Amino acid sequence: TQYLAAGLLELPSVNIFYGAPGTLKSFLIADLLVCIAAGKTWLEPAPWQTGGQSFPTIKNPVMWIDFDMGRRRTIERFAALARHYKTPTDAPITIYSMSNPPLDASNPGHIAELVARVATTGAKLIVFDNLGTISGGIDENSSAMIGVMFNLRWLADVTGAAIVIIHHQRKGNGIGGRAGDALRGHSSIEAAIDLALQITREPYAELINIEMTKSRGLEVYPFSAAFTFDHNNAGDLETAAFYSIEPDDKQSNRAIEREIKTALQSGGMIQTALWQAVKDALPDVTKNRILDYIKRMVARNEINMTVGAKNARVYTMPVFQ
C-alpha cells in the first residue's frame, strides 16, 4: 500500500476531513496539499517545543477544487503557504475556484470530465471544498448521497488518486455516543469512505486536534497542530503554516502504551497497581482494555512479567544490555 503522507491518504482512497466552522480544516488540508506538491514533511515539530507527530510525504501533483471560500481567499492562503515553504513557482498545484456551472458529483458526466482534467495534470491528491457544494443540491441526509459517494469512489479508482472531501459535523454534537456520529449527513457518506478525521479547535486558540473516527487501513493516532501566520504592512496574509505539537491523547492504544511505560519507569508493579495507575491517567479507558494491552505488550516483549509472592504478576521494563 502506498501513502501520500506516512500512514495517511492511501492511493487510491476516499477520505473526509470534517469539523465545525472555524476549526481551520480547509487551511490545514491546504497546508498538507502544498507539502505533498513540494515533497516536504507535513507538520514539522513546532520550534518552541518537542514532541508531536510529523508526516513525511511523497512528492506528487495535486489539485484543489473550491466551491466554498472563493478565488481571492483561496489564492491568498495558498500564496501564504507557498511563501512559508519556499515552494517553487512551477510546483505541480492545480487550483479551480468557483467554476460556473459548478461541479455536480451526482452527475457521472461531470466526474468523467474531471477524470480527463486530472489525467492532464497527473494529480494524485484531489481535494473538494466542500461536500455540500459539489452534491448537485441533493439533501445530504438522503439516500441519494449513495450516488455521489459512488461517483467519488469511481474517480479515485480511475485516477489512482487520494480524494479528500472537506465536510462539516453535526450541530450541537454533545458528549457521549460514537465519535463517527458527529459526521453530518446520511449514513452512506461514512460507509463509503476509507478514512475520516475529525478536527476540533478550542475557542480563540490557534491549536487544533485531529482524531480518527473511521479507518479501513492503518490506525491513525490522535495528533495536534499549531497554526502560525503573519501579515505584511498592508495587513494582508504574508506567510502561514502548521506545526506539530504534543497531542492531547487520552484514549488511543498509543496513550495506553505510553502510560504503562510511564508507570513502570519507577520500578516493577503488580498487575492491580499497574492497571490502576494507567486508569488514573486515562479515566475514559476501561480496565479490561488496559489489561488486554498489558498482555499484548508482554507478548511483544515490550515489558516483562514475572510471578512474585503469592503468585502475583509483577511487571517491569526490559533491561537492555
Predicted regions mapped to residue ranges:
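Post-Walker A helix-loop "phosphate-sensing" segment adjacent to the P-loop in P-loop NTPases
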Residues: 35-50
